[in-house]
Amino acid sequence: MLEMYINNNNTEFQKQQLWTAIVQAKQDGLSNEEIIENVQEALPDAMVFYAETVLKQIDFRAKLSRPVVEFNLEFLFQVIYESVIAGTNDNEILSICAEHCTLNQYEFVRYALEYIHLHRMPSQWEQNNVYQKMIEIVSSSPIESLFEYIESIKNIYLKQIGYELVQENLYNLLLNNKPISYFTDLANQSKDKFIKNYCCRTAVLVARATGKPLDLKVTGDGSIILKETKYLNSEIANNGIVSSNILTMGQAGKLLVDTLEDFNINAKYVDAKNGPTFNRIRVKLERGVSYKKVEDIGNDLVQQLGEELGLKVAPMVSVVPGGVVFDIPRLDRQFAYFRDYFSFDGEPDIYSVSIPGGVDVDGTYVEIPLYSDNVTHILGGGRTRGGKSQFEKAAILYLVRRYPPSVVRLALSDVKRVTFGKFDGLPHLVAPVARDAESTANLLDYLVEEMELRYQEFERHSSIETIAQYNSRFAPDCIMPRVICLIDECFDLLSDDNYCDRIETALMKLLAKAGGAGIHVLLYTQRPDKNVIDPLIRSNFPAKTAFVTTRPEDSCIILGDDKDKRAVYLLGYGDFLYKTTEVLRLQALYVADDEDPEYFQQLLLEAKNQNDPYTAWKSGLDFDEFVASLYDESSSNDNGKFKATTATKTKQSKTDFEGSFSFKVQLDEEARNSIMNLHQKGYQLDEIVKAVFNLSRQDGRSYKKFRNVVEEFLNNFKGGGEDDI
C-alpha cells in the first residue's frame, strides 16, 4: 500500500490510500507506535503528521462507539479532553460526535470544547510557541496587531502571556512620550477589557507625568471618551490645580492667604505639594491667631474659592509642624494600584511583619508595622464606598503572599459574607472564615486561649516577655507566627444579644495583652456607634484608620478624639487617615480584584504554593477540638447556649449577693483600676458602668445600683476616702 502511495503524486489520493492502510493496520492489531514507525520509514514528514491525525480520529471514534448501551457526560468530557490534548481538530471532534451522540450530548460537547480551550493548562512548548509568535508580531507590526492576536486566543493562560507583553510595550510607548490620546485610542480599538484597562492606566500615568487633568468617560458600548483640559503654557501644566482661571500652586496659595484675610485671619504662604488625591497648601498663621479660627472654614472656602480652585467639597484643614495645611481635592485624582507597588521578590523579613498602608502626599509608599508598639491593634471604620474593604483585602493579600504560614496566620470574621470569602481555603487561616456572631465568638475565645499558651511558653524561658524577644532568640530554627485577626463589620457582632458579651469579653482580653504575644486585632465597622462599641474596647487600640464618614461624631469615635472631625472631609475610595503618634493622610492601595481577577487569583495561587522553609512553634491547640469543648453534652437542651460566659463569671466575681433582690457590691482591684483609668480619660458615669460591668439604663435597678457604687467610689477617691464600698 505504501508503494502505491510513493508512485502516485496526487495528494488527495495519497491521503485516501494512507487512511485505508492505517485502518487495515489497526484491524491487523498494530499499535499506534508501530504504525507511525512504518510511516516514518517510508513517507515524508507531512504524511507522518497526517497519519498521527488519522490515528487520533480513529481512537476518538472508537471510544465513542464502545459496546455499551450509553455513556455518561463525565466519560464524554474525559474523552474530549484527551482528544484536545492529543491535538485533534475541533471540527473533527464535532463531526465524530454528531454520528454517535444524542442532541443533548452534542450540545454538551460544544460547551465542553469551549471550556477546555479556555481553562486547560498549555504545555511549555505551546506557551513558548505562542510567546515567539507574539514577539514576531511586535517586531514587525504595530501594537494593534498584537491586540488582535491576543483577542483570537481563547486560553486564559496563553492570554496572560499576551497581557504581560502588552504591559511591557505600553511602558515602552510611555517612555517614548506618546500623548494621552494615543493610549485612549488604543483602548477604543481593543475589544478585550483587560487591554482596555491597561491602556487607560497608561493614559493616567501620562496625565500624572505631564500634569494634565484626565477625564475618562465610558459610554454604553464600552467606548472611552477622553476629555482633556487645555493649558495655556507648560509652566501651568506642571502645577496641579485645575480651575476655570488656571492657577499655579504658588498663585493658589497666595489667593488662599488673601481670602483668609477677608475672614480676619492673618497668615503667610509657605509652600505647596502635589499629591495623588489632593494638593496641599501650607500657610503660617500670624502670632496670636488661633487654629480654631480656620478649623471649620472649609465650607466658606468652597463658597469663596470654589471657581478659582475647582473646589466642589470642603478642603480638610490640619495642623502640621510649622503651620496649617489645606488639602485641596484634585479634579484629576490618581489611584494607587496594589500591583504597581509589590513584586514579592526576595525573602520576607520574618521579624518585621507589616501590612500595606498607602501613598502620602509626596507619593511615598507608607507601610503599617504591626510589630511596632505604636500599632499592635487597629480600629477602623467609615461609610460605604469609603475604601475600607479594599484596604482590608490589600492587607490580607499582602500578608498571605509575602509571608508563609509559619510566619503569619490569619483569623477572619466576615458577617457580611462578601469581603473575605475569596480567601477561604488558604493555609494561613487558623480556622474557616467566621460568618456569624457565634463562630466569631468561638474564634475570639480560641485566640484568647492561644494567647495564654504563648505567655506560658514565654515563662519557660527566662527574660522573654514578648514574641519579638522569642523570635529573636529562636528564629529561624523555630519561629512563633504572628496571628492577625481581622474583623469586618463589628457593629453587627456587638449588636447580637446572644453573643455580644462573649465577643466583648474576648476582645478586651486580647486588646489588653495579646499584642505582646503576637496576636493583632484589626476591628472595622461602617457604623462606629459609641453605644455599641464599648469605650474600654475603643481606648485600647493604639492605631486608628479612619475612612470617610457621614457624621462628624463618627470621625471623633474612630480617631479617639472628640474634637477631630476631619474624616468627614475625606474623599472616599481609599482616602483615609492613619493615626498612631501622629496623623497621616494616605491613599490606600486598590486591589482591583474585580477588574483584574487573573492577577488576584494568581497571587492567591502563589500564596497557597509558596515555599515555607521555617519551622513554626505550635501551641498544640486544635480549633475544632477547642470549639467542641466550649459546649457540654446538654447543649441541645438549652438551645446551644454557652454554659457560662466569661463575662458572667467576671461580673459574679465582682459582686457579693445577699438575697434575691438586694445585693452589696464590692469592687475588686481590676474594677477599681478600670474605673479610675476611664475616669481620667474623661468618660462619663454611664460609659464607665457600661465598660466595666456591661450594664446600661435598660438594665433598670441593677444599672442604678452599680452607677451609684461607681459614683460613690469616685467621690471617696477625690475626698481621700477608702476605695472599697
From Swiss-Prot:
Pfam families: FtsK_alpha, FtsK_SpoIIIE. It comes from the Bacteria. Keywords: ATP-binding, DNA-binding, Nucleotide-binding, Plasmid. Residues 363-556 form the FtsK domain. One of its GO terms (molecular function) is ATP binding. Disulfide bonds: none annotated. ATP binds at residues 382-389. InterPro entries: FtsK/SpoIIIE/SftA, FtsK_alpha, FtsK_dom, P-loop_NTPase. SUPFAM superfamilies: P-loop containing nucleoside triphosphate hydrolases (SSF52540). Probable DNA motor protein. May track DNA in a ATP-dependent manner by generating positive supercoils in front of it and negative supercoils behind it. Although strongly related to FtsK, it lacks the typical transmembrane domains located at the N-terminal part of FtsK. Belongs to the FtsK/SpoIIIE/SftA family. PANTHER family: DNA TRANSLOCASE FTSK (PTHR22683:SF41), SPORULATION PROTEIN RELATED (PTHR22683). This is Uncharacterized FtsK-like protein all7666. It comes from Nostoc sp. (strain PCC 7120 / SAG 25.82 / UTEX 2576).
